[in-house]
Amino acid sequence: MNQNPIPNSFRSGPDEDGRFGIFGGRFVAETLMPLILDLQAEWENAKTDPSFKAELDHLNTHYTGRPSPLYFAERLTAELGGAKIYFKRDELNHTGSHKINNCLGQILLAKRMGKTRIIAETGAGQHGVASATVAARFGLPCIVYMGATDVERQAPNVFRMKLLGAEVRPVSSGHGTLKDAMNEALRDWVTNVDETYYMIGTAAGPHPYPEMVREFQSVIGKESREQMMAAEGRLPDMLVAAVGGGSNAIGLFHPFLDDESVRMIGVEAGGKGLDGNEHCASLTAGSPGVLHGNRTYLLQDSDGQIKDGHSISAGLDYPGIGPEHSWLKDIGRVEYVPIMDTEALEAFQLLTRTEGIIPALEPSHALAEVMKRAPKMGKDEIILMNLCGRGDKDIFTVGKILGMGL
C-alpha cells in the first residue's frame, strides 16, 4: 500500500494534523505544545481575515517592493543555446532575498498574538537580516541565533543585523551551522514561551510553520504565473529553484503544482560530492526521520543521529528539508537533484558576466542545473528560475576561493 497516495490536487495539504502523506506533523516538547496550538488557531483566523491580508499586501507593495520583476535573460539564453531562460527577480526585494516575504507575514502574526520578543535562526544571514528588519519596523527586540561558522563566512549580513538593532548570538556547538542555530533557538523558545515568538525562516519545523511559510512565499509563484502569461501567453515548461529548507522553492512551485505541463526541479547542495558526508542533499541521499518538530528526509546515520553536512552556501547547509518537499519527491511530482560547490561557483561567475547580476550562492546552485538543462531543450521551450537572493553577502567567500583578496 502506498503510504503517500496521490491526491485529487497536489495543493490541498497539509491535513488537519499538519501532515503531507507520512511527512510533517508536530513533534515538540510538552512545554511548547500549547503555544503551537495557539499559533495554529491564530493562523487559521488570520487566513480568513481580510484586514490581515490587506495589511500584508500593503507591506509587500510599499515596503518590500513587490511584485518583483520577471526578467528574460537574453544573453545567458544565447550563451547556453536552447530554452529561453527567465528569472523571477526576488533578489531585488528589500533586504536582498525572498526571506522578507515570510518575515512580514510572521511579524503580523506575532503582533496579533501579543508577543513582545522575536527570536530567529539563520544560516546565510538573509533570514536573520529580514527578521531584524521587520522587528525594527515594528519596534520589537530581536535575537538571531547563527552558527559560528556562518558568522565567519557571512560577515556582511552579521553587520547588517547588528546595524538593525538585533543581537546576534553565535552558536559553536556541532559544526556551527544552521542546524545548530535552530537547536539553540528552540531551546530559547522553550525557556521563554510566554513573551517570545519564534520566526522560523524556512518551510520546515512543527505544524503550522511549513504551511504558513509556504503561504507567505507563494506570492512568488502567483506573481510568476501572471507575469509569464503576460510575457509569453503561456506557462513555463520548467521551474527550477534551490532547496535548503525549501521555502523559496515551495513558494515558486506551489501555485503550479496542478499544472501537468510544468516540470519542477529542486536543486540541493551536492557539496564536494555524494560519496562522503560533505554535502547537504537530504532528498537525494537521506532517509525519513524526525528533526526540529517534523518528519522529513534527513541526513542521518544508521542509529538515527543527524550528520553534519557541508555546502559552500550557508543557506543550503542544512541536513533536512521541508516536509512538503519530502512528500512531493515521494509522489514523483517534483524532481530533486544535487549540484556540487564547483558547479555553483561556475554558475555564479557566468551569470555575473553575461547578465550583470551577482547572484547569491544559493540560487547559483539552481542556475548550475539550468546550465545543464537549457542546451538540451528546444528554443521554443521556457525555463523559469527563482533568483531568490543577491550575492553581496558571498563576495568574501567567492573572493577567497578564486584567489581575489578583498
Swiss-Prot record:
SUPFAM superfamilies: Tryptophan synthase beta subunit-like PLP-dependent enzymes (SSF53686). Pathway: Amino-acid biosynthesis; L-tryptophan biosynthesis; L-tryptophan from chorismate: step 5/5. The modification N6-(pyridoxal phosphate)lysine is found at residue 99. It catalyses: (1S,2R)-1-C-(indol-3-yl)glycerol 3-phosphate + L-serine = D-glyceraldehyde 3-phosphate + L-tryptophan + H2O. Its EC number is 4.2.1.20. GO terms for cellular component: cytoplasm. Pfam families: PALP. Its cofactor is pyridoxal 5'-phosphate. GO terms for molecular function: tryptophan synthase activity. InterPro entries: Trp_synth_b_CS (IPR006653), Trp_synth_beta (IPR006654), Trp_synth_beta/beta-like (IPR023026), TrpB-like_PALP (IPR001926), TrpB-like_PALP_sf (IPR036052). NCBIfam families: trpB. HAMAP family: Trp_synth_beta. PANTHER family: TRYPTOPHAN SYNTHASE, TRYPTOPHAN SYNTHASE-RELATED. Tetramer of two alpha and two beta chains. This is Tryptophan synthase beta chain.
